[in-house]
Amino acid sequence: MKYLNQQEAISVDEELFNEYKFSVDQLMELAGLSCAHAIADAYSPDRSNKVLICCGPGNNGGDGLVAARHLSLMSFVPYVYYPKRTDKELFKNLQHQAESMGITVSVDCPAGEWVEAEFGLIVDALFGFSFKPPVRESFRPIMEVLQKTKLPIVSVDIPSGWDVELGPQTDCDIMPDCLISLTAPKLCAKHLVNAKHYLGGRFVPGKLEEKYAMNLPAYKGRDLFVRLS
């Protein structure tokens, strides 16, 4: 299985939109749904049913908003931290859908002590494969919470703060308990240490997989994810 570099990941996304005519909301829904299913596979809601989902301003954050909605239908209780809103209709709709299902969507950075006491699991959907260090000032408080937490962290596609190709660059980078790679793993996933690794996003056309020599593993039956490790 191939691990994509940053430019390959960007190019694959562009081809899905331009060549294969997928829409952003279509891929986001499929990606977020697969994340929710992978999380439900990895963590029992009996132990981790209250989930803090940290969403950034881009498509990675959109995946997190979708995952929150689906997790709420799987016996989890999501709480979304979504500090940097956008005027794009898609993201407004995703927020509205989450709130309409009784999910709290907050702009206030949660205190570390409250997070430890209140939640059993954290989902990191802050930054995706377009991220380039350093982390912006406005996101440093939540990154500090993620760096210091003793709770398991599930990162969506890229552990936030990591270099997309080189992985963690400092001792302070977060170390997820689980990574859900989307479409195909990125090079940074080779730097995971003792972490669960899932692949989600069961929508890659065969010709596109062949063009980039992805050699993706087969999904079983109706599964929306593959566990890689």
UniProtKB/Swiss-Prot annotation:
Top-level taxon of origin: Eukaryota
Positions bound to (6S)-NADPHX: 59-63, 128-134, 157
Cofactor note: Binds 1 potassium ion per subunit.
UniProt-annotated binding residues for K(+): 60, 124, 160
Swiss-Prot/TrEMBL keywords: Isomerase, Metal-binding, NAD, NADP, Nucleotide-binding, Potassium
YjeF N-terminal domain residues: 9-216
Catalyzed reaction equations: (6R)-NADHX = (6S)-NADHX; (6R)-NADPHX = (6S)-NADPHX
NCBIfam families, per the entry: yjeF_nterm
Function in brief: Catalyzes the epimerization of the S- and R-forms of NAD(P)HX, a damaged form of NAD(P)H that is a result of enzymatic or heat-dependent hydration. This is a prerequisite for the S-specific NAD(P)H-hydrate dehydratase to allow the repair of both epimers of NAD(P)HX.
Protein name as annotated: NAD(P)H-hydrate epimerase
Species this protein is from: Anopheles gambiae
